[in-house]
């Protein structure tokens, strides 16, 4: 019973969070009796809201918390507040289909907390790990699957954490860089590579991976007018290929 297994683990995590919350409540409640400070009162109210949910065996990610409450709770590193992905290990046949009666139950359970479920066959993944890229691609096409379970997990994890990728290319190497959605080109993305890029940012020369894939070369992308010059307010997009212009 996968739901039973999930709940056994969740109870342990809930008890861990409950201990942290109740220890803090014991301290802040005494302080609130004398100070009546608004920040302390807000903290106490938020912690008691969490305590009530945990006592009902409810993970904190299932509790409706606003931005201020989430910001306050961030410092406590509460496990059940963290986003989660459920991975269901199934047979090879069920992995090809994409579900079975048990994964359907897990998906229903996960939907109540806005979590996702990745269905994989550990046996199949082990076999794929031994293949080269061409053999792996041919095998997946033969069984009608676009991505391996491991690839699906990576994509889901990136999405869950709000991460995306941009690329840089030079004479010696091509590199992928991870950034958070909503980052601006000079503000953070250039700085990921080197602080000088951020400090002396002038412009970003940008083309998309999809355009490069379609036209076949950087020159043809430029000829098609798909290469762009972006300034300091440009929000980086997933799959951007970037040449940073800077001067320090």
Language-model regions: role of each:
Residues 1-14:
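Conserved P-loop NTPase nucleotide-binding/switch module
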